[in-house]
Amino acid sequence: MNEYYQSPLSQRYASKEMQALFSNDKKFTTWRRLWIALAESEKELGLDITEEQIEELKAHALDINYDVAKAREKEVRHDVMSHVYAYGVQCPKAKGIIHLGATSCYVGDNTDLIIMHEALELVQKKICLLYTSPSPRD
């Protein structure tokens, strides 16, 4: 359900690879990768963040608890904060450092850029395959 982006157009015209790039799973695991990178950088800069907290974040980077995030979003009406909360439920030791000092744009905009970059790489790969494959007239 969350593995692939779903719309009538994507189901008809997009490859499974492209649908996976724009899926909820990709979006929210990228948010978590960005929060891990943020925590690692802040630790390196001297903030009071432990390796144990970072390891806890890494341990739950891929198992998105969609049900908790969805329930929280109904309360707070904010997608990023609902996922911060949901990640904190899974990572109680690291709860206080998730999204520390960041804005919603940190995860939203950077995730969009990462996904667009990967999508363009996929398009480039497919164009190169077309360009290098023999012509039907040959």
Placement of each model-derived feature along the sequence:
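A helix-coil-helix interface module used to build multimeric assemblies
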Residues: 1-134
